[in-house]
Amino acid sequence: ERHRAWWKKFWSVSEISLDDPVIEQRYYLSKYMLASVARDPEYPPNILGISTFDRPAWNGNYKINYNHQSPYLNLMVSGHFQQSDPHDAPYLKLMEISDEMCKRLLHHEGLYYPLGLGPHGLVSEALLLHMKSPAIHGALNMIYRYGITEDETYAQKVYPYLRGVADFWEKDLVCRDGVYHVVGDGMHERTDGNIRDNGVPEDPVNTLGYLKTFFTWMPRISEALDLDEKKREKWLEIAENLAPYPKGTIREIQENPTLWKEVDVKLEDLLPEEMLDKEIYYDEGIGGKWSFHFPGNVMQIYPGNA
């Protein structure tokens, strides 16, 4: 009876009706899976979801470069906050370590997170791969949660984390002629060899988007909580003066090394001639401007192998 009552309550929160029965079935199937594994606030589901293996890929951890963040968006917009809130646990438990890591590696304060986290403050995979965005990417889920609910109790819980992320970027952004640039942060995973080939990455399109949203919302949240009044002007100033999203044409990046090392086919062979000169957004302003492998960092692979 308790089992039935739990599911009845869960399904009564929201519903959808679609013209396509296959997509509708997949929607409810994904909800069923996430509701089954995302119940313990201290132990959110890892990258493998419902799957188990003796030697799990990616160490079976919380991969916080989009894999961990993305599934919870669908829970939040459908009102299932009890299942979406476990997302936050790995971030909140690692704040002390990540602050120390930032001081040692970047020589300033703030929250600087590695790629693979475990529960209870465990670093499962101490890889950085030339990325600085994982912490702010996770912060966006928290901001969306507050934006949907305006739950000040929740905001109080996550605010120390959000403030730590703000501290990181206030100190790490490079201001040139009044414009804030992201330096040393790849759009996605970057090897040392890739950095040697393409240079230190700057102004990744995804991180610029994260920063715009983050620093636009931080003054609102701090005002709701009556905290950090003196910081709000600075946060808005950053949001309004970020570097523009990198863009150009396909023809202009035909010689970009990242185009040719991943696949044998040339990008120009996949597109009609008239599209080669249309303006597009690049992955990074400096560095790997295009990738067959990780286009725009919008794909995600959760649950891997399921």
Located regions from the model:
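Acidic/polar, glycine-enriched structural segments that form the non-catalytic walls/loops
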Residues: 1-61, 81-85, 92-100, 286
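Extended, hydrophobic/aromatic-rich amphipathic alpha-helical segments that build helical scaffolds
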Residues: 24-36, 135-144, 160, 164-169
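Secondary-structure transition/capping motifs at alpha-helix termini
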Residues: 36-41, 78, 82, 145-156, ...
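Glycine- and aromatic-rich loop/turn segments at beta-sheet edges
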Residues: 41-56, 101-105, 113, 173-187, ...
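Acidic/His metal-coordination segments adjacent to aromatic residues that form catalytic metal sites
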Residues: 48-59, 112-129, 183-204, 279, ...
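Active-site core of glycosidic bond-cleaving carbohydrate-active enzymes
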Residues: 61-100, 104, 117-123, 127-160, ...
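Acidic/histidine-rich catalytic neighborhood
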Residues: 164, 168-224
